[in-house]
């Protein structure tokens, strides 16, 4: 799951972790159940069954099953079959090629916005229309191997409320 640029992203993530631990969705201590970097993540806990559509698909017996939190500017897209298609919310025209080329300016933080080359509409990059879920953010939550279980919409909504931000659930197939 990812959101938009968040000032105080570490404080936001700590609040999310405390909430997830209270609901017994993740365990409190970091372990090596992640996939990236030093592999440190919060392991899956029994309460996760209550927030997914298919609890039997949760990766309880997998070594990689934890929640990783990413604090750097990242682009979150499906790993397979991402079409790089985007539309302008103002003129409703396809601008995907130009938008994805502009990421060279977005990644290092030169800008948070994109301007439609067709109508001049400027907005935060997450304000543009994407055919597939994706997100551009300095805060990301990677639930390793949870995609098949599928999150309940009520959980996604509550997660966004805790963040106090709009967010995207990007399902990554590795």
Spans of model-derived segments:
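N-terminal alpha-helical interaction blocks
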Residues: 1-81
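N-terminal leader/targeting segments
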Residues: 72-75, 83-90, 100
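Short, non-ligating residues that shape and space the ligands of small metal-coordination modules
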Residues: 96-98, 125-126
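Short cysteine-rich clusters marking metal-coordination/redox-active sites
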Residues: 88-91, 116-119
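Long, charge-rich boundary regions
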Residues: 117-174
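Flanking scaffold residues of small Cys/His-coordinated metal-binding clusters
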Residues: 80-83, 110-111
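Short secondary-structure junctions
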Residues: 21-33, 97-98, 163-171
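Short linker/helix segments within small regulatory modules
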Residues: 101-115, 131-132
């Amino acid at each position: 799951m990812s959101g938009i640029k968040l000032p105080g992203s570490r404080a936001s993530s700590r609040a999310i972790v405390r909430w997830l631990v209270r609901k017994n969705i993740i365990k409190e201590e970091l372990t090596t159940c992640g996939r990236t970097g030093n592999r440190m993540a919060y392991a899956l806990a029994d309460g996760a069954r209550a927030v997914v559509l298919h609890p039997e698909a949760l990766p309880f017996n997998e070594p990689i099953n934890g929640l990783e939190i990413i604090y750097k500017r990242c682009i979150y897209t499906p790993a397979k079959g991402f079409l790089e298609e985007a539309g302008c919310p103002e003129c409703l025209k396809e601008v995907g090629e130009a938008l994805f080329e502009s990421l060279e300016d977005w990644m290092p933080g030169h800008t948070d916005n994109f301007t439609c080359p067709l109508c001049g509409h400027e907005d935060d990059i997450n304000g543009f229309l994407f055919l597939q879920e994706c997100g551009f953010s300095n805060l990301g939550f990677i639930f390793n191997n949870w995609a098949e279980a599928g999150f309940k919409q009520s959980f996604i909504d509550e997660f966004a409320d805790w963040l106090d931000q709009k967010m995207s659930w990007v399902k990554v197939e590795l």
